[in-house]
């Protein structure tokens, strides 16, 4: 059985990579993908904690159920976010965050 710390370290590394992508990158689609990576890292830690909390040898499935619910909500978020990004690209012919300031005009 893999220890809980390995899952949490992996989750932390994935979250840090996603956070760095959000901070450093300028392309909206890449930022969106990094946000989804951060959400997946949070789901991984949630499932890992749920697995480690099992009582009397039986696994606790609360974390898995919540993770599936979060993934369902994230799918709707992806659909709406990509629709907004495509709409922005059609209007401005760019997907860079530096050009978003022109939306104020």
UniProtKB/Swiss-Prot annotation:
Write down the superkingdom of origin. Answer: Bacteria
Q: Which reaction is the catalytic activity of this chain?
A: a quinone + NADH + 5 H(+)(in) = a quinol + NAD(+) + 4 H(+)(out)
Q: How does it assemble?
A: NDH-1 is composed of 14 different subunits. Subunits NuoA, H, J, K, L, M, N constitute the membrane sector of the complex.
Q: Name one GO biological process term.
A: ATP synthesis coupled electron transport
Q: What is this protein called?
A: NADH-quinone oxidoreductase subunit K
Residue ranges of the TM segments: 4-24, 28-48, 66-86
What start and end residues bound the annotated signal peptide?
Answer: none
Bilayer topology term: Multi-pass membrane protein
Which is a Gene Ontology cellular component entry for this protein? plasma membrane
């Amino acid at each position: 059985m893999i220890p809980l710390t390995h899952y949490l370290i992996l989750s932390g590394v994935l979250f840090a990579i996603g956070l760095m992508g959000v901070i450093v990158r300028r392309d909206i689609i890449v930022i969106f993908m990094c946000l989804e990576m951060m959400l997946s890292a949070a789901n991984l830690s949630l499932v890992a904690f749920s697995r480690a909390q099992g009582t009397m040898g039986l696994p606790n499935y609360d974390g898995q159920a919540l993770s599936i619910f979060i993934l369902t909500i994230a799918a709707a978020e992806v659909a709406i976010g990509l629709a907004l990004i495509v709409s922005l690209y059609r209007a401005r012919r760019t997907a860079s965050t530096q050009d978003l300031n022109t939306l104020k005009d």
